[in-house]
């Protein structure tokens, strides 16, 4: 059995470059096996950057890797956009779906516009949505037309996974033991994107304080497209009837008290990209006040959005048209969301009593001292210092060095 499997594998890889695996993205004829293994390990740990650059030295396998990526949407057949349904009226391009019809097979499908994709934990990648945002109802989408792609691709769908940093080998004392000094400008170029979803449970006696507002405007949390203030997404206060007058005083609602629960989203410049509100009570029985007005604005937007989705998709389903599995799933989901008798569960799989506010945050994560950097030939190091651009060496042509590494490491790594 083992012999047969080996013979089958030998036929599969015979004459193929695929046997080199991830090392096709490095220069296998210029490095030894230890550095090749190091590069392969580092490749598994990389985070997609907000803005990538094409490598100056191509191995010619970068685009092949990008071709098999799932981080872009290429249209498979010629389609027409039947409808564009937006979730937020005041920010129509934040979240929406396109309902399309295949002009060859007459099958209906949906395309969801998202800011990015969340992967394991909070890791993820951002989409470039410029093209899909420019499309309108009635427009034809051509075959092989790319509607959106991750920031690892350029407009020609060429793949990149890092940046080209102007580097200098020297004996700077801050570069000992594989330490690396980078400039402020390189720090910004190495910004990555993460996505976090925060769920805030609100009981009958809970209110969100006026953390984002002022004495004229009550605002509990950032609106779509707004940045988070001081790493705090929202501040929940449980009202005790014995001190309700104190807790609900306008001045105190703009403060964070010791008994409050603050929802933090640390480590980055954060922006809200999506909001959902789930309610297990009859909304008509909940008194609307200034404390929950912002929450119910988003609840009303979500219900209106999914009501329109359910109505539009329902017409397609009831006519007996051909439609995709994605369309069928969204039709069922939208029906659940607008069903007043459907009960939602919390993170503990228990039906909650009042409201859960779900906020999706896009986080811009910059480099800090202690961050790891890796090159394309199995080289790596830890950032020891981030210097101002004017403190970095300057070349005869006026360019500033972006990264300083230890010259003694060259000989040491050649022997590794």
Regions found by a protein language model. Name each.
Residues 1-366, 371-372:
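Long, charge-dense accessory insertions within large macromolecular proteins
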Residues 343-344, 354-416:
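Conserved phosphate-binding elements of NTP-dependent enzyme cores
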